[in-house]
Amino acid sequence: MLPLKFHEGGLIPVIVQDQKTREVLMMAYANEEAVRLTESTGSAHYYSRSRKKIWKKGEESGHFQKVGRILVDCDEDCLIYEVEQTGAACHTGYRTCFYRTLDGVTIGEKIFDPEKVYGKTGH
Amino acid sequence: MLPLKFHEGGLIPVIVQDQKTREVLMMAYANEEAVRLTESTGSAHYYSRSRKKIWKKGEESGHFQKVGRILVDCDEDCLIYEVEQTGAACHTGYRTCFYRTLDGVTIGEKIFDPEKVYGKTGH
């Protein structure tokens, strides 16, 4: 495994890309343990800065990400998880978190109703 | 324009994606002015944390990025620049900065010799 440069409290940014469609689904952060768990289990793990803990994508929603390859950038301070996404990546119900242009035009496809998946208390 | 949440010294992470091949080319940071310049000129601008200034991709190498669309994520704290890349995105000469797997296997394609483009003093 290449040495990684973790920063900002031991975190590394992770770009999540659909391995078939090449769509960018989301961006999140991982710490060293989350990267190791992702490698060893084949299921995407991240670190939540707000909840201050590791989370497995899909643990609440069922929208897991099966990780095929992990890529590293030239500076070794950013990763790509190439994934097979169950359901949708975004907690809003869109397939990708990047469902709008900077001008506010919605271009994404809504896959599920977040109230039904996460309940009314949010994600 | 959607309101953006800049953090870490007024910066927002930018994922750069080839608009045709959907390949993720690099990740960089932008401040508000860099985003505005990108919008108004159609050429990708970023903010260099080490040099503490705005830079236009390609200003030294000639490897400009013509920006088609800019996408925003659900939290409005991450962007995608969809670009048409001249030459290669990575200063190492590879088309994408993500030219290796986490295991250190090179999967990317080298497009240019960095010494010829940037000189021997680095980028």
From Swiss-Prot, chains A, B:
GO biological process: L-histidine biosynthetic process
Transmembrane region(s): none
Uppermost EC category: hydrolase
An MF annotation (GO) of this entry: magnesium ion binding
GO cellular component terms attached to this protein's record: cytoplasm
Keywords per UniProt: Amino-acid biosynthesis, Cytoplasm, Histidine biosynthesis, Hydrolase, Magnesium, Metal-binding, Zinc
Main localization, broad class: cytoplasm
Family, per entry: Belongs to the PRA-CH family.
PANTHER family (UniProt xref): HISTIDINE BIOSYNTHESIS BIFUNCTIONAL PROTEIN, HISTIDINE BIOSYNTHESIS BIFUNCTIONAL PROTEIN HIS7
The protein's name in its UniProt record: Phosphoribosyl-AMP cyclohydrolase
Lineage summary: Archaea, Methanobacteriati, Methanobacteriota, Stenosarchaea group, Methanomicrobia
Gene name of the encoded protein: hisI
